[in-house]
Each structure stands twice: as C-alpha cells, then as structure tokens.
Amino acid sequence: MTTLLDPSSRSLVFAVFSVFVVICLMLCVVTGADEDDRALVRSDSRRLRSWQQGIAMGGDTTTVATVTVLVGMVATSGFDGLGVMLGSLIGVVLLLVLVVEPLRGHASLTAADVLDARGSGGPAVRVSWGVVTLFVCFPLLVVQLVVVGNVAAALIGQPGARTGCIVVIGCVMTALAVSGGIRGTGVVMIAKSAIALPVLVVAAVLVLHRFGGDLGRLLDAAAHGSGRGEAYLRPGGYTGEGWVGAVNRIGQTCGMAMATLAMPAVLMRAIATKSPRGARTVGRWMLGELTLLYGALAVVGVGAAALVGEALREAGPAAQVFTPLLLGRALDSGGLLVAALACVLFLTALAAVVDVTLAAGIALGRDVLGASGTTGGTASRWSAALTGTVSAVVAVAVADWNLVVVSTLWLAVCGAALAPVLLYALYWPGFTARGALWCLWGATVLSVAALALSPYASGAPGSILPGHDFRIWDVTIPGLVTVPAGFLLGWLGSVTDPRRAAGGRAGSGAEQGTGDRLNGPRAAHR
C-alpha cells in the first residue's frame, strides 16, 4: 500500500490536479465577493442560478470522507454501508421539504439571524450557535485534510510526506475559501461535481461490465470476496449484533439524516435561495445529483468487495480510505482510472474543505465575534484563514487517530444540537432562547460524553486510548439517544421559560414583522 501509481500515472494525477487548483483559484478571485459582508455570505442571484445552487448544495453534502469511507464501508460491511447512504438521502429529502423553502430569500446572512428573526435568538444564542457550528466544522475539516493527506502520500509513494501534504493542501484550500466567498466557492463546487460524478459513474459501469451486467453475480462475488459470506448481505457487519447493533443502526440512520439537514455549509447556501420556484429547482437538482452519486458509490463499493476484498482484509481498517483507488487499479491496469479516481478524491476534498472553511469563518466572524457590514466581511475572511490554519495543525496532530471517531463526533453534534434548534425555530412559535441554549449546549455535551464513554474512546483495538478502558456502554453511534435528547432539551427549556409564561417569546417582539417570512412554506403563499 506504499504506492498506488506508476511514475507516469503519478505525474498525470498531479499535473491535472495542479491545473485544476490554479483554475479554481482564478475563478474564486474573478467571481468572488468584495469586502462587503452580505456579498461574502450570500449569492448574487444573477451570478449563481438555482440549478447551479442545487448542484453546489449537493456537493456540500459530499465530502471526501463520503467517497472513501462509504465505499470502504460498503466493501467491508455490505448492508450497513448502504444504510449510511440511505440516512444521508433521507436527510436531503428532509432538508428540501422542511428547511430550504422557509429559509429562502430571507434577509439573513447566517442561521443565527434566523433565530433572531423568529424571536428565539439573542446575543447568547448567537454566540452559542456560532461556537457549536465551529465544533461541527473543525472535526469535519480535520477528517477531510487527513484523508486527502493520506491519499496524497500513498500516491507519491512516500508515507512520510503525509504531514507536508496536509499542510500544503490545507493552505491551498484556505486561500480558495478566503478569496472566493460563497459565490466563488460555489463555482468550485460545481466544477468538482462536473468531474467527480462522471468518473464515479464510469467506474460503476466498468464494475457492472466486469460481471456482465448481472447484479446477482456481482453480489455473490462481493459476499465471497468480503470473507463474510451470506452475512455480507445482512445487517451487523459494521454496527454489530443484538440490541447494540439495533441501536447503532437506528442511530446511524437517524443521526445521518439530521446531520445532513443541518450541515453549516448547506444552510449557508439554503439561505441564498431566491424564490419558491428557485427552491424547487434547487431541490430537483440536488436530489438528482445525490441519488446518482450514491447509486454509483454503492456499485463501486460492492465491486471493491468482489474484486479487491481480500487485499482490503489483509491491509486492515486503515486501508478503507484507499478502496476506490484499489478498485481502479483492479479495473484498469494501465493506471488511467486510478489517476481519474485520485483526481476525484483531491477535488472532492478541495471543494468540501473550501466550503466548510468559509462556513466556519462566517460563524466565527459574524456570530461569535459579532462583526457586521464591511468589518464583518473582513472579520469573516480572517476568521476563515484562522480556521483553515488551525484545522491543518490539528489534522497533523491527529493523523494517526481512527477517523471514524472524528467523523462520528461532528455528525452526532450536528444532528443532536443544530438540527433540533433549526427545526424548532422554523416551525414552533413557542420556542424560546432558553430552549435554544439548553438544546445547543446540552446536546453537545451529551454527544461528546456518549462518544467518550464508548469503545471509540477506550477499551477497543481501534479506539483513541486502547490501553485504557473507561467505557460504560458498547454503543458507538449514539444518534438514537442524542437526537431525541436534543429535541427534548429544546422543548423542556422553552416550556419552563418564565418569560414565555409571562406572555411573550424570549427573544422579543421587535422582529415579529420579519418573522412572518420564516413561518414555513405556507407563509409564502398567504
């Protein structure tokens, strides 16, 4: 696993990637926003159309971890990997039905502005939302940088180059986020989708062609290649058996759906949607793109189990990140497909990190630091630069950790803390600032505690501290507990708020006029 490409293919990959980075940087500079805070965050309706917004939002939900980890999970675990994809698609549907249209066209710049407009905000809620958003964005950024650093080092054939790869790629991606704003990063996201989706579809077609288009043959070969036999087609390969497996599977689907609904980068683009018709166009393009993408990833994952399953078992869990590249080498010994798939991984990481860095920078600059106007634009850019730099440093420090732990952390916090607050603010008139604070902080602490006391933290070979054992339960995906707890905390904090009992919402009535635009889809047609 030290090298995946011959020298000629390696040169092709980095030549193509370098050209694409230069083009993306130029596009970000040309199409990016000026120093105005609103231009930095919101998309100019004449420069980014609804179908483009839909493609960009679909790209926001597709990180490099999605491509590598999901394909690896399908290859090694079968049914459970497909369950993760199902949870993500459910989250996209919920996002389009419940969130995009109520948010569209509002004067807000961030989701914290929505809470203010609904009367459930305030300075404490704004800062808390910003801090929890950063808590979600940092692990997500770290995962992307570590994955792409590992892949780059393997392609070079020098594992010791991983640190340098993480730092260089982190700097490039931070520069793109700072220079482009949401419009410029949208162009990068669209360009990534235009390249990644066709390559993955071609890989899926080649897999099907290898087995004569017979799905039965493909599944039989995958079951044999995975080493699990018929168990490959049943749940439990990743989530476990018995009641623990059931809790993990339900929590996996529930947590993935809620986290997809509330991803900060996705909300940033949802706010910029222009009209009900534009929201529907965004939804069609986003759902179509992701359905095609996940279908291709599922076929690629099953194909990897069939063709390189033995190599994956011998290499261990750490090799899952290289699954698409190993499959490419098995399908095309000439190296062209490996080169194309490597470019897809680089470009997916590039686009994801750029957008998440921008979302984190805006959360820090506007929500936490409270900057606005021209000052806000400058503060958000400097915050994005700081976020990218810190993420690269942290990625280097935790590069040897189990990345599934880091991924589960941001998914758990996003699904249990951000999603309930957003949905309550949009659809429950009785939601108050106290409820928002209880949900944001309570669900975040509960999510961290649930993972800290699980086998991900200690007591297992792949845990962060394998030499210690302070786990109190065997559940590794706590969504079944944390997501309902987040909703419960938001409800309990609101109904026990003395200011609500006194006859008003805890935010203030000053913004009731603007709140009507956020009362949900029905308000738009009154």
Predicted regions and their residues:
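Membrane-embedded helix-loop-helix hairpins and adjacent transmembrane boundary segments
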Residues: 1-526
